[in-house]
Structures are given as structure tokens and as C-alpha cells.
């Protein structure tokens, strides 16, 4: 069967790529060898053309990777609308060097970034704004949350609504 469809890679595991095709579902696909020969690795978020091998079993081959809007190495994703960088406001103390590196990486890829400081219940408002104001003055939206107290969650969800978002940050941010 020579039926080609376009879709988006939603998951990649051990050389298998799961491609969501609107109106049809998710196809399990392998990438053609030409990608390996050209050292091109399909990424989650890639828009692709799939040659359907078995419509009933929903199997196919990725024939083409369409042009990417952006691509990140860690996490390995493409065509995202934005990034959410989450850091703890305290416990552990934020590593601003690491946060700045995240921001530089996203700026280089032209990916809009929202910074989320979690555990804001552990600091006073004055302490929190002492470091977060710097990022807001640079034009980065900053969201303050407390997962423990369920504060700021609605504001965070509003920023994520209807957007493909890559989430990054160190461990221990809550």
C-alpha cells in the first residue's frame, strides 16, 4: 500500500517513532535508513511524512522530516511553541548560572521562555522578588508557584494552554 500521510512524532523509543496522524490515530514507524546515513535523527515534535505499510496494524515508515521551526538537544525535541524552565525558589537554592544557560540555549533557538519559581511559600515576597525581578526586567515572564499550597497553578496552566511546551529544570524543584 503506497499511502502517504503527514503527522507529528509524539514519542520515540529504541528506534521506533510514534506518529500522530490527525483523524487516523497513532502509527508505529521506523525511520528510513537514509536519515541514519545523513546523521539526521527524528525528534519528538517533528512533522513528518509517513508511508503507511499496514493500515490495520497502524504501521509505517517515516519517509520525510519536514523543516523544523526549532530543535533542542536536551530534551531532544523539535517544533515547540515555548519552554518552561522550573527552578525552586529555595531548598535547593536556585543555581542562577544554570538558569542563565537554559535561557541562552532557548534564545539561541528562538524559543520563548517562561520561568517558574516553585516553592515560593518558603520565601517572603521581598526575598523572592530580589532575584526574580532581574529576569522580569529582561523581558522573561515569571510565574510563582507553590505545589504544596497549590498557589500559582492556574497562572501556570494559563501560560501552557494550547501550546507545545518543553519543560526543563534541575531535580528537586518540586
Model-found features: residue ranges?
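Short, well-ordered coil/turn elements that cap or connect secondary structure elements
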Residues: 24, 57, 108, 137-139
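Conserved beta-strand/loop subsegment of P-loop NTPase cores
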Residues: 80-87, 109-118, 139-145
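Residues at alpha-helix caps and immediate loop-helix transition turns in enzyme cores, especially N-
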Residues: 95-98, 127-128
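Conserved catalytic network of the ASCE P-loop NTPase/AAA+ motor domain
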Residues: 75-78, 107-109, 159
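Histidine-anchored nucleotide/phosphate-binding helix
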Residues: 97-107
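Residue-level signal for inorganic ion chemistry
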Residues: 45, 106, 118
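Canonical P-loop GTPase G-domain recognition
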Residues: 121-173
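N-terminal accessory targeting/assembly segments
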Residues: 1-96
